[in-house]
């Protein structure tokens, strides 16, 4: 995103010119002109159609920090490793930035809501990116699949039929596995592995049958890794009833954004992939008739400095994110877009242009959690720091980017006392 202010004093900055930007039709922020990179034409279309919103200057926070003076005072709790990739990736997934927690936001929601699904062997958290913190709960973990998942490749890969005695060999393999996982182990690690294996075997049998019913799509997904990941999610959404799924959380990743150099070329290559894949995924949810039941959002580790290092941009803090779906109050920019200046700017904490977040991940996630069906009573379990930023009221949502029409939440359903740790 760039505002008109970003085009002033260009010598040290990294903007596109206003002529290069792809503009938006309306705004809800103080500035009068916003636009996106020309490679984000699909994102622009989604925004202008009211199906996508931006969240400006969001980041990990333990408690609100009003300005640079409070940041420097030493009186405010700060996230661990603000400029560390590994720390901030973890903290965006947990929303507990004062500790290196192994339980994520999506995992805690699944702890509460997984029981609503019919087949308990199949986790409501499905990952296209393997093991991750975001989907790890106290009781629920992710079920990892590949983006080429279909009825013929889920579960064990059989010995090819042209092998001699292939049928016998496959039967022996399955019976051996059954024997191993059904053994009553006393060793805790063996017992845990056996239980996990049993659950996985039961899950892929249900998956195998359900995947036979995936319909043909008219929506064409890009061949990029993100496009194929989101295409796989669309196929899994199409068999949600066969899987007995009333709630699901999917997780994908896309790297390559640490652009200390080649920033212009890197964005020109990477952003169209994001735009095309997200547009195709939204179109697929429309095709399935579930656009208002699926919300897609992006998370990262941190933003980048607004001034150049000569070749690119370096680690910063508050940044921007996107939310997409039929239930999103789209065509708007939420949060507080910072003044694009490194001087006389109370939210800037570096001569390079590094902004204190105006919106916390807790507020962002609280809005998503309430829309998803988490009771206000349970918000403190899902987001332990939330009371530092927000007190629940049905007429005052955490941020405002979700449409809660049709929800049954009321002021009588008040949250428990939040315990910050």
Regions found by a protein language model. Name each.
Residues 1-276, 280-287, 307, 332-421:
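Feature for exported/extracytoplasmic and membrane-associated proteins, marking the mature portion
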Residues 247-249, 291, 299, 316-319:
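Active-site lining segments that contact anionic ligands and/or coordinate catalytic metals
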Residues 300-332:
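Histidine-centered active-site microenvironments of extracellular/periplasmic hydrolases
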């Amino acid at each position: 995103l760039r505002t008109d202010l970003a085009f002033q004093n260009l010598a040290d900055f990294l903007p596109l010119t206003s002529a290069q930007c792809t503009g938006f039709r309306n705004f809800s922020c103080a500035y009068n002109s916003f636009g996106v990179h020309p490679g984000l034409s699909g994102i622009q279309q989604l925004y202008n159609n009211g199906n996508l919103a931006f969240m400006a200057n969001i980041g990990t926070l333990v408690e609100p920090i009003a300005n640079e003076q409070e940041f420097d005072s030493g009186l405010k709790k700060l996230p661990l490793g603000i400029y560390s990739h590994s720390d901030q990736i973890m903290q965006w997934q947990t929303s507990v930035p004062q500790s290196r927690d192994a339980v994520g936001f999506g995992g805690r929601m699944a702890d509460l809501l997984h029981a609503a699904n019919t087949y308990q062997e199949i986790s409501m958290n499905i990952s296209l990116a393997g093991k991750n913190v975001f989907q790890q709960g106290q009781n629920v973990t992710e079920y990892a699949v590949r983006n080429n998942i279909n009825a013929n490749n889920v579960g064990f890969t059989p010995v090819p039929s042209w092998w001699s005695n292939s049928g016998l060999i496959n039967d022996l393999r399955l019976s051996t596995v059954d024997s191993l996982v059904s053994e009553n182990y006393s060793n805790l690690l063996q017992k845990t592995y056996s239980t996990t294996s049993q659950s996985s075997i039961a899950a892929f049998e249900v998956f195998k049958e359900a995947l036979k019913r995936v319909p043909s799509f008219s929506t064409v997904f890009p061949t990029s890794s993100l496009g194929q990941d989101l295409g796989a999610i669309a196929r899994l959404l199409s068999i949600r009833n066969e899987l007995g799924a009333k709630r699901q959380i999917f997780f994908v990743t896309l790297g390559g954004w640490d652009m200390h150099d080649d920033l212009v070329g890197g964005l020109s290559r990477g952003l169209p992939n994001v735009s095309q894949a997200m547009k195709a995924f939204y179109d697929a949810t429309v095709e399935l008739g579930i656009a208002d039941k699926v919300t897609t959002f992006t998370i990262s580790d941190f933003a980048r400095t607004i001034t150049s290092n000569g070749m690119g941009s370096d680690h910063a803090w508050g940044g921007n994110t996107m939310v997409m779906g039929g239930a999103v109050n789209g065509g708007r920019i939420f949060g507080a877009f910072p003044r694009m200046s490194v001087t006389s700017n109370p939210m800037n904490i570096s001569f390079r242009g590094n902004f204190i977040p105006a919106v916390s991940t807790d507020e962002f996630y609280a809005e998503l959690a309430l829309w998803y069906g988490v009771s206000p009573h349970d918000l403190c379990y899902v987001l332990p720091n939330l009371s530092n930023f927000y007190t629940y009221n049905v007429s005052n949502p955490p941020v405002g980017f979700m449409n809660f029409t049709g929800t049954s939440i009321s002021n009588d359903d008040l949250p428990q006392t939040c315990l910050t740790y």
